[in-house]
Amino acid sequence: MDDTAMKKAKTEAADYIEANQEIFVDISHQIWQYAELSLKEYRSAELYCKILKENGFDVKENICGIATAFTGHYGSGKPVIGILAEFDALSGLSQQGGATEAKPIVAGGNGHGCGHNMLGAGSLAAAMAVKQYLEQTKKSGTIVFFGCPGEEGGASKAFMAREGVWRSLDAALTWHPGDTNEIVSGTCNSCIQVLYRFHGVA
């Protein structure tokens, strides 16, 4: 793809997302309201799977033995591009949207302290834009939307890697809400949680 075609494709993707922004903002707001903890994101996963199915994605639920993990495939052939979504909340962070001071929806309830409501919705917007590109151009390519629950506990991605769900990918992309636009290209260590219990006399 030459520079002109690349710029055109990027502009069309951005235009698609802009034209459909209310849909993606509404999804983000729904996930905010659900505020489900790690590996208990049942309504959130159900919402994403429903939307993916309605838009022609081949959805596989309960992957890797995780009830709220899923994939949505669209297209065929190479390249195979994965887009990762997270949607879990944290305990004790319930908050009314738009409030700049503590205003919990439910006192002591769950809330999205890390913006995973936006992370999942933004990833879906990207996947849908790629789907539209594949539809319009009839080009070879597969987009895979990965529902990755339990990020706050370092859970699902490790199990998904163990089961080999990433092996068919040519590239995997994700993003995270923040206060700057930047590309992170470094590496980070794996996360392993271990509980040690010591018995005996100190």
Stretch-by-stretch model annotation:
Residues 3-112, 117-141:
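Acidic/His- and Gly-rich active-site-bordering loop/insert found
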Residues 68, 90-92, 101-111, 117-118, ...:
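Histidine/acidic-residue-rich, glycine-tolerant segments that coordinate divalent metal ions
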